[in-house]
Amino acid sequence: MSAVTVNDDGLVLRLYIQPKASRDSIVGLHGDEVKVAITAPPVDGQANSHLVKFLGKQFRVAKSQVVIEKGELGRHKQIKIINPQQIPPEIAALIN
């Protein structure tokens, strides 16, 4: 499975998360996943909620349209973006 998959209702992203980074950013490929750096620490779900908020802004969707499908408690996550309004250039470059 590739890092970015296009479905009928949106995108599925396989992510590797780097918490407690100096700034929020989509770094690029990390193996067969997309590396995303976020500033929030991995404590009490702070990193997950921060990730959902960050991806919502990047894809211009509501937070409810960003769904963590797998990896709630780990660094490796599978995220579904429902009907993205915009696709960041870092992700667009990975879509086949």
Swiss-Prot record:
One Pfam family from the record: DUF167
GO cellular component, one term: cytoplasm
Listed InterPro entries: DUF167 (IPR003746), YggU-like_sf (IPR036591)
Chain ranges passing through the membrane: none
Source superkingdom: Bacteria
Similarity annotation: Belongs to the UPF0235 family.
UniProt protein name: UPF0235 protein YggU
Protein species of origin: Escherichia coli O1:K1 / APEC
